[in-house]
């Protein structure tokens, strides 16, 4: 506990919050170009081949982003839209690619949670 005299001398420091997605620079989404599309293996208890892409953003950052859903059409030089949101079992992956925008196609034959995967209404 500081004394009143200490508080007069120097005021209390404000706590600064560290952002969880610095590459977005306070924007909800960011556009970028894929520099590499590959698969990655998750952390210890899980086992899979998760689809990820290295993306160079318009803000100048180069980040790793997760490609959600089953199957994708992304390749090098594809223009994608990124949102925040980490993948818990992939270290260093703090962003998600938004399906159904720009060069990213929506998930085919998706019936539930369609809006999250850019899928149109099934006939």
From Swiss-Prot:
- InterPro entries hit by this protein: NA-bd_OB-fold, Ribosomal_uS12, Ribosomal_uS12_bac
> Which SUPFAM superfamilies does this UniProt record tie to the protein?
Nucleic acid-binding proteins
* Organism, scientific name: Prochlorococcus marinus (strain MIT 9211)
**Protein function:** With S4 and S5 plays an important role in translational accuracy. Interacts with and stabilizes bases of the 16S rRNA that are involved in tRNA selection in the A site and with the mRNA backbone. Located at the interface of the 30S and 50S subunits, it traverses the body of the 30S subunit contacting proteins on the other side and probably holding the rRNA structure together. The combined cluster of proteins S8, S12 and S17 appears to hold together the shoulder and platform of the 30S subunit.
The alphabetical list of record keywords is:
Methylation, Ribonucleoprotein, Ribosomal protein, RNA-binding, rRNA-binding, tRNA-binding
Cellular component, GO, one term: small ribosomal subunit
Q: Quaternary structure?
A: Part of the 30S ribosomal subunit. Contacts proteins S8 and S17. May interact with IF1 in the 30S initiation complex.
Q: What is this protein called?
A: Small ribosomal subunit protein uS12
Q: Does the keyword Glycosyltransferase apply?
A: no
Annotated family: Belongs to the universal ribosomal protein uS12 family.
Q: Which NCBIfam families match?
A: rpsL_bact
Which residues get modified to 3-methylthioaspartic acid? 89
Question: Which Gene Ontology terms cover its molecular function?
Answer: rRNA binding; structural constituent of ribosome; tRNA binding
Query: What is a biological process (GO) this protein takes part in?
Result: translation
Q: Which gene encodes it?
A: rpsL
Q: Does the keyword Ribonucleoprotein apply?
A: yes
Q: Where are the transmembrane segments?
A: none
């Amino acid at each position: 506990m500081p004394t009143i005299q200490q508080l007069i001398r120097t005021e209390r420091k404000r706590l600064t919050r560290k952002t969880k997605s610095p590459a977005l620079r306070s924007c909800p989404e960011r556009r970028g170009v894929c520099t590499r599309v590959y698969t990655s293996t998750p952390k210890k208890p899980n086992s899979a081949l998760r689809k990820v892409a290295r993306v160079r953003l318009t803000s100048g950052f180069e980040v790793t982003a997760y490609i959600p859903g089953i199957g994708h059409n992304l390749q090098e030089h594809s223009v994608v839209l990124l949102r925040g949101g980490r993948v818990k079992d992939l270290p260093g992956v703090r962003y998600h690619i938004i399906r159904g925008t720009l060069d990213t196609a929506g998930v085919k034959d998706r019936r539930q949670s369609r809006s999250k995967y850019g899928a149109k209404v099934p006939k």
